[in-house]
Regions:
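The conserved acidic donor/metal-binding loop of glycosyltransferases
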Residues: 114-118
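Conserved donor-nucleotide/metal-binding helix-loop-beta segment in metal-dependent transferases, i.e.
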Residues: 119-145
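N-terminal nucleotide-binding beta1-loop-alpha1 segment
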Residues: 1-28
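Short, glycine-/small-residue-rich phosphate/pyrophosphate-handling segment
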Residues: 152-162
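Acidic donor-binding segment of Leloir-type glycosyltransferases
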Residues: 56-80
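A short, N-terminal amphipathic alpha-helix
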Residues: 41-58
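Short phosphate-binding loop-to-helix
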Residues: 73-109
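Short glycine-enriched, charge-decorated loop/helix-capping segments at active-site entrances
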Residues: 27-36
């Protein structure tokens, strides 16, 4: 319950993470080999999940991945790790993670969050979660305004990633 007496929405984040061997492929080149890209992707995901788990209204982070190293590292941070059972791309992984979150926690809000947000601050996520209102989805576009960094579905609203 907030200071105003209103019930605070509880949120569960869903974070899909590719297999590290496929991560950050756009950075491939002579100065960035596969091992370096994998370490970078894992560090990005770890930073993002750590910041998310420290946010006040966040009750859980569900990481959807088939990579055992990702699962181990993010599980050690406190995330729930589930296999990418759909194995059909980003949107099915997000929908599956949202289903897992609501099965475990009931009527929570769900946030689909990109794993590559290493500069995410807990205070920024707290602010964004507090700004979501009503019964509709909200989103935060990526820096290039061509994708989505976060997609918010309040309690009772389907995540419906597209």
């Amino acid at each position: 319950v907030s200071e105003s007496g209103a019930a605070q929405v509880r949120w569960c984040l869903v974070v899909p993470v590719k297999k590290l061997a496929m991560a950050k492929s756009r950075l491939a080149g002579p100065r960035m080999d596969a091992a370096t890209r994998a370490r970078l992707a894992l560090a990005f995901a770890g930073d993002a999940v750590s910041a998310a788990l420290a946010a006040g209204p966040v009750v859980e982070a569900v990481v959807v991945t088939d990579d055992p190293l990702v699962g181990s590292a993010l599980g050690e941070l406190g995330a729930t790790v589930v296999p990418d059972r759909p194995d059909a791309g980003l949107n099915p992984a997000l929908a599956f993670g949202a289903e897992v979150a609501r099965e475990k926690f009931g009527d929570v809000g769900v946030v689909a969050m990109a794993a590559d947000l290493p500069a995410l601050l807990t205070s920024e996520l707290d602010f964004a979660l507090g700004a979501v209102s009503g019964y509709q989805r909200h989103f935060i576009a990526d820096a290039q305004d061509v994708g989505t960094s976060m997609l918010f579905a309040p309690p009772g609203v389907e995540l419906d990633p597209r």
